[in-house]
């Protein structure tokens, strides 16, 4: 799985429509499948997207309103049916442990997969396992809700022409990486002079929330900011009373965060044309898309910092 992309499996809030399923979002990245907020019917959406559910390795639940978690149980059962051998990590607010258990054990089946739970009871870095660093922050919603920032580590890349000019090859390259310098024939060579840093990419996933500082912090310089925009500005009063955002508010948060790309989602069923969200947000933040089911949003590797 060498691709780097977000695939939208659903983008409706609260209830599905004839054209939009409840939300579910899959990031395929660094040989992992990161599934966020699987709503009702997510398992079936994988079929329509022509993606094997077995790519999923980590599941994130922002909060336990039904449209963000009702697909959890069926996804775990499907992975069990498919006999996946890799662990399935599940991240969710610790305060919702009883709801997680109800979803996981809501029906009779023989569980054979290895599910590793990560109930989150604090903000900040909640896991760093080499491929990614996972950060969680509390959002401003009606119930305990987490937003997520996923960041890959920076990597050091050698500059081929400089390495060749110095005649370096083989195990000594690992010595240079480890020690930051090596001495050959009385001459000291420094890693910083023979390499560059490729900054690790970040993505942010913002589910239900009013605009708040946590949203900006999570989305700071993110390659993709996936953000709820339940309402348009004409219904801003509903957004405020239900603790959601409008498309304009989401765009304003993306601009403040310096995000590179904004993907809007979680559209209220009252709106038939999601294009309206994109048009509203573009007035503030040009590089924006209204999520479309089964569409892929790619984020190729960042160019190196030489």
UniProtKB/Swiss-Prot annotation:
Its cofactor is Zn(2+). CDD domains: RNaseZ_ZiPD-like_MBL-fold. The active site is at residue 67. InterPro entries: Metallo-B-lactamas, RibonucZ/Hydroxyglut_hydro, RNase_Z/BN. Pfam families: Lactamase_B (PF00753). Zn(2+) 1 binds at residues 63, 65, 141, 208. Zinc phosphodiesterase, which displays some tRNA 3'-processing endonuclease activity. Probably involved in tRNA maturation, by removing a 3'-trailer from precursor tRNA. This is Ribonuclease Z. The lineage of its organism: Bacteria, Pseudomonadati, Chlamydiota, Chlamydiia, Chlamydiales.
């Amino acid at each position: 799985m060498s691709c780097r992309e977000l695939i939208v499996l659903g983008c409706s809030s609260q209830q599905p429509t004839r054209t939009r399923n409840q939300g579910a979002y899959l990031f395929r990245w660094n040989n992992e499948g990161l599934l966020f907020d699987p709503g009702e019917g997510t398992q079936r959406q994988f079929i329509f997207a022509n993606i094997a559910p077995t790519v999923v390795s980590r599941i994130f639940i922002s909060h336990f309103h039904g449209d963000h978690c009702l697909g959890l149980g069926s996804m775990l059962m499907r992975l069990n049916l498919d006999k996946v051998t890799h662990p399935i990590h599940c991240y969710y607010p610790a305060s919702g442990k009883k709801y997680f258990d109800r979803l996981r054990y809501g029906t009779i089946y023989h569980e054979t997969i290895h599910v590793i739970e990560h109930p989150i009871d604090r903000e900040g870095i909640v896991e760093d396992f080499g491929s990614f660093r996972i950060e969680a922050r509390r959002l401003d919603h009606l119930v305990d809700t987490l937003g997520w920032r996923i960041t890959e580590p920076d990597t050091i890349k050698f500059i081929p022409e400089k390495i060749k000019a110095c005649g370096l090859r083989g195990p000594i390259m690992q010595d240079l990486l480890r020690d930051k310098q090596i001495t050959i024939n009385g001459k000291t060579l420094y890693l910083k002079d023979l390499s560059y840093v490729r900054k690790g990419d970040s993505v942010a996933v913002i589910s239900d929330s009013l605009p708040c500082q946590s949203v900006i912090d999570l989305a700071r310089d993110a390659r993709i900011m996936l953000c709820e925009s339940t309402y348009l500005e004409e219904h801003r009063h509903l957004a405020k009373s239900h603790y959601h955002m409008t498309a304009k508010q989401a765009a304003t948060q993306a601009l403040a965060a310096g995000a590179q790309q904004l993907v809007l989602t979680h559209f209220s069923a009252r709106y038939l044309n999601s294009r309206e969200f994109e048009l509203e947000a573009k007035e503030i933040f040009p590089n924006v898309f209204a999520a479309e089911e089964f569409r892929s949003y790619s984020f190729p590797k960042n160019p190196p910092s030489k």
